[in-house]
Amino acid sequence: IILNSSTTDERREAYNCDITYVTNNELGFDYLRDNMVIYKEKLVLRDLHYCVIDEVDSVLIDEARTPLIISGQSGKSTELYKMCDYLARQMKRGEGDGEISKMDMLMKTEVEEDGDFLVNEKDKYVMLTANGVKMVEQFFHIDNLSDPENMEIQHNIILALRAHNLMFRDRDYVVKDDEVLIVDEFTGRIMPGRRFSDGLHQAIEAKENVKVKRESKTLATITFQNFFNMFDKKAGMTGTAQTEEEEFREIYGMDVVVIPTNRPIQRIDQPDSIFKTKKEKLNAIVEQINESYRKGQPVLVGTINIDASEELSHMLSKRKVPHKVLNAKFHELEAEIVADAGQKNAVTIATNMAGRGTDIKLGEGVAELGGLRIIGTERHESRRIDNQLRGRSGRQGDPGESKFYLSLEDDLMRLFGSERVMSVYDTLKIPEGEEIEHKTISNFVEKAQKKIEGNNFAIRKNLLEYDRVNNEQREIIYKERRRVLDGENMHEVILKMIKDDISAAVDQVCSSETAPEDWNQVELDDMIRNIVPFEEPVTLTEEEIRKADIKELKERLNNEALELYAEKEKEIDDPDQMREIERVILLKTIDRKWTDHIDDMDNLRQGIGLRSLGQRDPVVEYKFAGYDMFNDMTAAIREETVKLLYRIKVEQKIEREAVSYTHLRAHETLSDL
C-alpha cells in the first residue's frame, strides 16, 4: 500500500510487489517525479503493465480535464491581480442575455451592450463591452487594450470578472485558514493542494482578500487520459458507467459491461416533481422530510453545493427537525455522518459527497418503514451524479425510494430553456405552490442533461487532441532522459552536439546563395564564440573565401572545437568524473528547457483558436507550430549543454553528490558572461 506519507524507499518496495494499492494521484505524481530525478536509484516505478481502477468513471472522466501538475514558484508579481480585482468591483455587469458568440470570443470583439461587461453563464465566458474596454484603458493609462503588450492586463481583468461573476464561495471553493481551497464539483469534497490554473486561483484570492500566492511555473504535467493510456492493459469498476459508454470506448478503448446486481433492486425511483420557484420547491422538500422524520424513515437529501445544503439546514432548524450536514466544510466528519444516515429518524443533508460506494446500513426496523429515502434538491449536469445519489439507497436488495424536486429557477432549467417548461405551466394553468409531474418536462430535463454531457465529452475529446501533441513530445523527452539516467555514455552525444552547433551557425551565416565575400564574419564569430569559447576571433582564410567550401569550413571549425573540448577534459583527472558531469549537466539542461517549453506550448494553446478564422483546423495548426517549437527547444538544449560544458570550472576533485553544485557553478559562470 502506498500512502501520501510513504518515503521513496517505501514506494519503491511497494511498487515491486505483485499487487500495489495506490490512489490515482499518488501514482501519477510518482510517474512525473520519476522523470525529474537525476540518479537512477531514486526511481520508484516499474513499467506500467496492468491497472484496475476503482470508481473508474470518477478518475477517467470527471478528473480527465484536470491535469496532474508538479510546479515551482515563478517570479511573477501578484500586484496586477489586486489592481484588477479593485477595478472589477467598480465595473457594472450588462443587462444583456449574455449570449456571446464563439466568434466574438475568438475575435475579442467589443460587444456594443449596456454595462461594462457581459457574462455567458452557459459557456462560462466573460466579455468586455466598449464601455468596459475604455474603463480599463483609463484605469491603467494605456491607449489600446488590444495591443500585444497589454495582453496580460486584458487576461487579468477577465480573470477578475470571472472570479466575481462565475466562481462562487461555498460552491466552487471554500475559504479556510486564509486559504482558498477548491471544491470538487462532482464529489463536493475539498481538493487540498490543487489550484485553479492560468491565474484564476490568484484572482479568487484577491477577491476573497487573502494572501495572493505567486503564480506557479509548471515543471511537469500529464493528464489522467494520457497517463492511464500508457498501461498495457487497464480495467475498472463503478456503478455508473453505462451513460458514458461511448467515451470509455473512444478515448480509452474500454468496453462497458453491465453486471447484474447481487440481489434484485427494490428501490422505487419516483418521477421528478417540478415547481415554479425555488422557494416553493424548498418548502415542499422540507414538508416531505418532516413527514418522513415523524414516522421514523431515514432521509438522505442531496444538494449540488454548500450554499444549498446550508439554506435547507436553516429551514429544517426552524421546523425543529434534527439533522446532520455533510459538505466540504465538515468533510472530517464524513465517515461518522454517513454511518448513521440509515438509522431511524436520521436526516442527513449532503452535497455530492455522500460517499461514492459507501454502504449505508439500515437501522433496526427501517426496512419496514420503506428503507432509506433519497431526495434530490436539483438535477446535476451529469446523469451519473444523479444515479450515484439514487444508488445510496436500495443496496443489496434493501427497500428504498428516490425522488428529485426541481424548480424553473434551478441552474439546469434556467440555462437550458425554462421558457419551454414555463409554457407547459401556463397551458396547464398550475396554481402557485403546486407541483407538476409531466412526461414532457421529465423528457426535457433528460435531454438537457444529455446535451451537457455531450458538450463535456466534446470538450474532453478536444482537450485530448491537443494533449496528444504534448504527450508525443513528453514521451520523446522522457525516453531520451531515461537513456541519460540509465548511465549510458553520453560522450559521443556531446561531441555530436558540438559539431551540430558549429554546423548550424555556419549554415545560418554562410549561405551557398550568398557570395563568400559577403558572408558576415563578425556575426559568425559572435555566434560560434557564444557557444565555443575560442580565445582568438573566428575568421575565414582567403583560401576558404575563394573556394567557398562550406563543408571544409565546418570541418576546420569542428576540429578546433573538439580540440578545445579535449583540453577541457584534461582539467579533470578522472574520465569517469567527466562522464558524470556530462550526464548531470545534460539532464538538468533538458529539465530546464522542457519546463520553459511547457509554458510556451500553453501560451500557444491560448491563442491558437484565432487561426480557425482562416478556415484552418486549430488542432492541426497547433501540431505544426508545436513541432517547430519542439525543434527549437532541442536546439536550445544542445546549445546550452555545450556552453556549460566548455565553461565548467572544477576547483577540486568532486564526489558524485557534488556534481549538481558544479553544474550550478558552471551556470553562474555562463550567466555572468
PLM region spans:
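Extended, charged helical/alpha-beta scaffold domains that provide interaction surfaces
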Residues: 173-181, 187-195, 396-397, 404, ...
